[in-house]
Amino acid sequence: MAKEKFERSKPHVNVGTIGHVDHGKTTLTAAISHVLTKTYGGEAKDFAQIDNAPEERERGITINTSHIEYDTPTRHYAHVDCPGHADYVKNMITGAAQMDGAILVVASTDGPMPQTREHILLSRQVGVPFIIVFMNKCDMVDDEELLELVEMEVRELLSEYDFPGDDLPVIQGSALKALEGEPEWEAKILELAEALDSYIPEPERAIDGAFILPIEDVFSISGRGTVVTGRVERGIVKVGDEVEIVGIKETTKTTCTGVEMFRKLLDEGRAGENCGVLLRGTKRDEVERGQVLAQPGSITPHTQFESEVYVLSKEEGGRHTPFFKGYRPQFYFRTTDVTGTIELPEGVEMVMPGDNIKMVVTLICPIAMDEGLRFAIREGGRTVGAGVVAKIIA
């Protein structure tokens, strides 16, 4: 079969498999690839190709991840699968693979296990918006009541972490049997694909969001005023738009009087573009790196938040020793470092390199943030951890 060319016209959705070790995440990933390419065309990936996950580095952290792609009639999916539990933790916290939705794989022979719970908690903390459940290995369970019991348990567990446990789709299937080509089980994979299509809404494209540009540099151009430069994170800024400067100092309002890219004047700057924005009446010393330029009212500055953090291991170039409460590192948001203090959960005295932990961070000056924002933890310019804002406190 000829290689299909990448269809730009279909909506692109990012998904991934999560769940306990050996519950069948990689087998399911292979089964989805196999059944969908058989049904709708494309190129299938087998278990060995997916299992042999290449090493990637995201912010200095080594993560093994497999990426596969598949199509349904209406969408193009990019799917991420990780071989080890630690890879999941790192992947979700660094946002190396941002998921629009996750497929939680639970072996019906085991029911929910410790990592099932941990992956659900992580999904909640890092802002995975939708979860679909695939109960795997159902060919090995003859007792219909047992399957119902496992399904109930999984739904309750999801509800415990504020996912709509009673309403989300649960598909009972067998990834291995589907991979072996048994029609009744292949049908379950198609049912899963339909659930992905209907239950996970089309993600908002970066360009459709509220405008935000993290400021990297500030220049003053004689006779014209102050220019800030950076890469537009989302949205569009047009000449004449009112914008806010948020973070570090008091929030101020100004107007965009010009946009330029590669020394050419433009009418607008769009998500993904590096550009300079000319600000009316703003003095050079009123803006600095680390602030953001944003659509008024779309983002606010905060100093205190709950976060989920992964602490780099010694092998990854992280700390060699644990840290304790009272630890004061730098927190690197977008373009700048801000000092902050940490509060550990009750009963936790110290944090070891290689751990993941929930902590409350208090910064010495406010940063423009919303839930889901990623950051690095640094000591003297060296990254020692990665985190995500789970909940804003103040």
Swiss-Prot record:
The keyword DNA repair does not apply. GTP binds at residues 19-26, 81-85, 136-139. PROSITE patterns: G_TR_1 (PS00301), G_TR_2 (PS51722). Keywords: Cytoplasm, Elongation factor, GTP-binding, Hydrolase, Magnesium, Metal-binding, Nucleotide-binding, Protein biosynthesis. It comes from Shewanella loihica (strain ATCC BAA-1088 / PV-4). One of its GO terms (cellular component) is cytosol. Monomer. Gene3D superfamilies: P-loop containing nucleotide triphosphate hydrolases (3.40.50.300), Translation factors (2.40.30.10). Residues 174-176 are annotated as: G5. This is Elongation factor Tu 2. Mg(2+) binds at T26. Residues 81-84 are annotated as: G3. Residues 19-26 are annotated as: G1. Its EC number is 3.6.5.3. Residues 136-139 are annotated as: G4. Belongs to the TRAFAC class translation factor GTPase superfamily. Classic translation factor GTPase family. EF-Tu/EF-1A subfamily.
